[in-house]
Amino acid sequence: MAIKQLSETLINQIAAGEVIERPSSATKELVENAIDAGATRIEIATAGGGKGLVRITDNGSGMSPADLELAVRRHCTSKISTTLDDIRTLGFRGEALPSIGSVAKLTITSRQQGAEQGSVISVTGGKVSDVRPAASNAGTIVEVRDLFFATPARLKFLKTERAEAAAITEVVKRMAIAFPHIRFVLSGTDRSTLEIPSTGDDHLARMAQILGAEFKDNAIEIDAGREDVTLTGFAGVPTFNRGNSSHQYVFVNGRPVQDKLLLSAIRGAYAETVPHGRYPVAVLSITLDPAFVDVNVHPAKSDVRFRDPGLIRGLIVGAIRQALTRDGDRAATTGASQMMNAFRPGYSPSGLRPSPSATWSAATSPSRPLAVSGDMQFAEAAQSRFSDITMPTARAEPREAYEASQSPSPEPVLYPLGAARAQLHENYIIAQTENGLVIVDQHAAHERLVFEEMRNALHSRRPPSQVLLIPEIIDLPEEDCDRLMDHAAGFDALGLVIERFGPGAIAVRETPAMLGEVNVQGLVRQLADEIAEWDAASTLANKLEYVAATMACHGSVRSGRRMRPEEMNALLRQMENTPGSGQCNHGRPTYIELKLSDIERLFGRS
């Protein structure tokens, strides 16, 4: 079969298959064009999940009739001219408009700022009309109808209208976070209007618009730099987490990306602070010389390649961990709101609702909980009636019981976690603060303190090792022995001392004391397998931290142990001085704070 030149329309349709995967892809490309045009107001209207209509209206610089004619031609752009090493705009290929026009019905109406009249051009299935005069406000309107009508096979791969509309919403949210000075409005027949007002230069306020006010209350500021690379943004405290990674936003030179390297760095930064299956919330912006990052490696420009990926990963992990160390003793404010909800009549985490109640009567007075559906009762368990409370008697109590029942001696309440006042169910410490109270899970809190102490010893100095009375000799393939010995110095720094023991054998003379009784054969063989793929030293370090966490769990104050007042206060003071004490090793909160105003609201005093 002879080789022949493809038609321009077919070339554009092939390009559209890479650039325009779904309606949200078209929306992304068009919104990027509006931002590059300097728009401060962008309106997006959709129908049919974007399959029927996507209309982008902006107040940007607009286009002249000559520019409009070139805009629908492939690889015509005003954003680059000679090189890809200095890309400072979101778009640069000149592919989006001709690609969309080849598979849909495209109409562009535009008027330059200061021009008396606008112009319009249409592209239907790759066929371009002449440029015509048109009435138009300053700026540009791009209308895409019947997406993929020219390639109907593509329609079979689209999701439901609801799913496609949700994908468009996510695109708009990402753009809105990156550009807080722009007002976005998203509307259409298949959605309620989403209006995102401009917040100027206040990035945190824009994040609160998108992620909710709770994020603002639980965010830690990130501001770090290394070798002309800066990292700014906000990261949530570990206990403020979500069930998926959709609340992680990363921007490179203002460009929203979903790069695996960057998302992996965020996960690494929160290692051992977020529960398994939960994901931290973060909004990070990386700024660097455009020459040091390649944004042209993915058709949709969602992935990037850094000249020094190790530098970027290290910066993200280090900056977040430093911020968590600085403010990591904070617990998420959502705990207090959940506690408040638990005290409300009829509350249940499973969503059970109380039965309709009549007007006030003795049967529904505060001395008796409101009736609710199922077995759930007020505050999850039925509260005792006031009439059931045992009245005081003149019977003498043993002195030991009397002393144990007394509240701890008064302590200053000006500490961040206050002064211990009581212990509930031999597991929870109640502390009074200057403006409320704190409830501490004693086991989770002490578990974190022990773990941090062990981890500090691990990273600040060589962990203690235990000398084996008889060295363990392990037979391995020669290549495994070579790889292990290449990393012997790194192992030694972690307390594992190995030596050559002739051909195809390794002698283990010392093991980390933290590991206790360890299967030396299994450990070394596992390291030999892993070292071919990862850095074995870091693998061992992670193993040591995991073991340290396990040991801390077993060595901490157990639930069910009665603590003396001075022990409770000592635990509170240690928590205040320990980074990351706001959550245990498994990512659960160690304490919940309830403000006095919240308590007063429970009793209707506010």
Swiss-Prot record:
Domain of life from the UniProt record: Bacteria
Keywords annotated in UniProt: DNA damage, DNA repair
Compositional bias (Low complexity): 353-366
Statement: the UniProt record of this protein carries the keyword Repressor: no
Pfam families xrefs: DNA_mis_repair (PF01119), HATPase_c_3 (PF13589), MutL_C (PF08676)
SUPFAM superfamilies registered for this protein in UniProt: ATPase domain of HSP90 chaperone/DNA topoisomerase II/histidine kinase, DNA mismatch repair protein MutL, Ribosomal protein S5 domain 2-like
Entries under PROSITE patterns matching the protein: DNA_MISMATCH_REPAIR_1
GO cellular component: mismatch repair complex
InterPro entries noted in UniProt: DNA_mismatch_repair_CS, DNA_mismatch_repair_MutL, DNA_mismatch_S5_2-like, HATPase_C_sf, MutL/Mlh/PMS, MutL/Mlh/Pms-like, MutL_C, MutL_C_dimsub
An example molecular function term from Gene Ontology annotations: ATP binding
Biological process annotations from GO: mismatch repair
DNA damage among keywords: yes
Region listing for Disordered, in residue ranges: 340-366
Family: Belongs to the DNA mismatch repair MutL/HexB family.
Record function comment: This protein is involved in the repair of mismatches in DNA. It is required for dam-dependent methyl-directed DNA mismatch repair. May act as a 'molecular matchmaker', a protein that promotes the formation of a stable complex between two or more DNA-binding proteins in an ATP-dependent manner without itself being part of a final effector complex.
Protein name stated in the entry: DNA mismatch repair protein MutL
Native species: Agrobacterium fabrum (strain C58 / ATCC 33970) (Agrobacterium tumefaciens (strain C58))
Lineage, highest ranks first: Bacteria, Pseudomonadati, Pseudomonadota, Alphaproteobacteria, Hyphomicrobiales
